């Protein structure tokens, strides 16, 4: 029925052209969006396998459909590898995304109208941590904490807010915070008010797995994550916990299915299993160590060039460039760097006077360039080129010169050989 040698460019040339252009973009542009990475050819091979054809509602050994004996193997491999990777006693690999993993935990442990205490989106948090434009901020009474004048989480303020509002859940984690989080302190705050502690480690899961960032599992009631970003797997979500009570496990299992999802994506779950196996390899730890070294090199160089980094540096894979007071906005900087084939994203910074669609900041991250093979000196060079463009965002000559240097660097470090 379906020939295995069918060619997309012959059947759907418009789509094939768009895909080919994206492949070229990924090879020819430097990727510095902190939430992006390149997964392996093995991950892509499995995600494009015939497992996409199989419906498998339920869990391994307890499906609502027949013929699941082989996808059961794939899911169980993903579960056991995730548990080994993070030191977990429980893992659910079915969430379709990190946002759905967070949603599952909220619905499992809270009632609509309950109070949650999460990091403000404007100060480095995530939409799903109680932002008023997200369902987490609409269904729940969301109280938000932030960073102090030094750009660091204000734990005293978090504690004060917790004592004042008595949340049912405290949410720790971020999408744009460059320092280490004190999970012990967060658990102590949650315990003071009898709240659950949910940690969203989506951005640092790969660093945690490699032991180069503190593991939240011994301290949180529940931990969620994406499976891409620093973990370098397929796009998806995961829920893990260490020594959870049986009642908590039952709530989490039943809320993922049938609570908020139907059939799991078995081809994605199998790809997660491959990514987790890759993350258990010794080379993955070396990779994550280099991610942090590269981020530090980039942040230090940008600061030497006169650019402010929120919190004064980085201890993970990302940094937030604060351009408040400068003529160039985050949006304009993103556009100018894009012309130089450096891909970044505009980002709000603490106390940003500009709108979220314009912003006064840039978020930069090193997971993708480190996957390509970049070392510290490459990131120092790249940071200088970024500063060159930010110093003269409307200068076509500067942009062209940087674009030429980027092309040579990308050619030196191809994504897929």
From Swiss-Prot:
Xref: NCBIfam families: PRK00011.1 (NF000586)
Domain of life: Bacteria
Binding site for (6S)-5,6,7,8-tetrahydrofolate: 121, 125-127, 355-357
Site keyed Plays an important role in substrate specificity: positions: 228
Residue numbers of N6-(pyridoxal phosphate)lysine PTMs: 229
SUPFAM superfamilies: PLP-dependent transferases
Cofactor(s), by name: pyridoxal 5'-phosphate
Protein name: Serine hydroxymethyltransferase
Catalytic activity: (6R)-5,10-methylene-5,6,7,8-tetrahydrofolate + glycine + H2O = (6S)-5,6,7,8-tetrahydrofolate + L-serine
Function: Catalyzes the reversible interconversion of serine and glycine with tetrahydrofolate (THF) serving as the one-carbon carrier. This reaction serves as the major source of one-carbon groups required for the biosynthesis of purines, thymidylate, methionine, and other important biomolecules. Also exhibits THF-independent aldolase activity toward beta-hydroxyamino acids, producing glycine and aldehydes, via a retro-aldol mechanism.
Oligomer and partners: Homodimer.
GO molecular function, one term: glycine hydroxymethyltransferase activity
Record EC number: 2.1.2.1
One BP annotation, GO: glycine biosynthetic process from serine
């Amino acid at each position: 029925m379906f020939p295995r040698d069918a060619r997309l460019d012959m059947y759907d040339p418009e789509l094939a052209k768009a895909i080919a252009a994206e492949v070229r973009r990924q090879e020819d542009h430097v990727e510095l969006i902190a939430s992006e990475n390149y997964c392996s050819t093995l991950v892509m091979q499995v995600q494009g396998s015939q497992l996409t054809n199989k419906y498998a509602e339920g869990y391994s050994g307890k499906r609502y459909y027949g013929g699941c004996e082989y996808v059961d193997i794939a899911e169980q491999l993903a579960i056991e590898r995730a548990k080994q990777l993070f030191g977990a006693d429980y893992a659910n690999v079915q969430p379709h995304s990190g946002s759905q993993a967070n949603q599952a935990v909220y619905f499992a442990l809270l009632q609509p109208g309950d109070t949650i205490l999460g990091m403000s989106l404007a100060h480095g948090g995530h939409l799903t941590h109680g932002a008023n434009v997200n369902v987490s901020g609409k269904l729940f009474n969301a109280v938000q904490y932030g960073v102090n004048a030094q750009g660091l989480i204000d734990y005293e303020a978090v504690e004060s807010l917790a004592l004042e509002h008595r949340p049912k859940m405290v949410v720790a984690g971020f999408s744009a915070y460059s320092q280490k989080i004190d999970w012990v302190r967060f658990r102590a705050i949650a315990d003071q008010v009898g709240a659950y502690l949910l940690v969203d480690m989506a951005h640092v899961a790969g660093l945690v797995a490699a032991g180069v960032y503190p593991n939240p599992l011994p301290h949180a009631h529940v931990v969620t994550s994406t499976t891409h970003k620093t973990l370098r797997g397929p796009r998806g979500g995961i829920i893990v916990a260490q020594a959870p009570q049986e009642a908590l496990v039952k709530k989490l299992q039943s809320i993922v299915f049938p609570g908020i999802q139907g059939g799991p994506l078995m081809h994605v779950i199998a790809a997660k299993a491959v990514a987790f196996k890759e993350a258990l390899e010794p080379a993955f730890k070396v990779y994550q160590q280099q991610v942090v070294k590269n981020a530090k090199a980039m942040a230090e160089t940008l600061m030497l060039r006169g650019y402010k980094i929120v919190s004064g540096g980085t201890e993970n894979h990302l940094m937030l460039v604060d351009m408040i007071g400068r003529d160039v906005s985050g949006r304009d900087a993103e556009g100018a760097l894009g012309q130089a084939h450096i891909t970044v994203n505009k980002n709000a910074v603490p106390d940003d006077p500009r709108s979220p669609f314009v912003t006064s900041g840039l978020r930069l991250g090193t997971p993708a360039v480190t996957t390509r093979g970049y070392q510290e000196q490459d990131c120092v060079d790249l940071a200088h080129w970024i500063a060159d463009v930010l110093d003269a965002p409307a200068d076509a000559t500067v942009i062209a010169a940087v674009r030429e240097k980027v092309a040579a660097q990308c050619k030196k470090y191809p994504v897929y050989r």
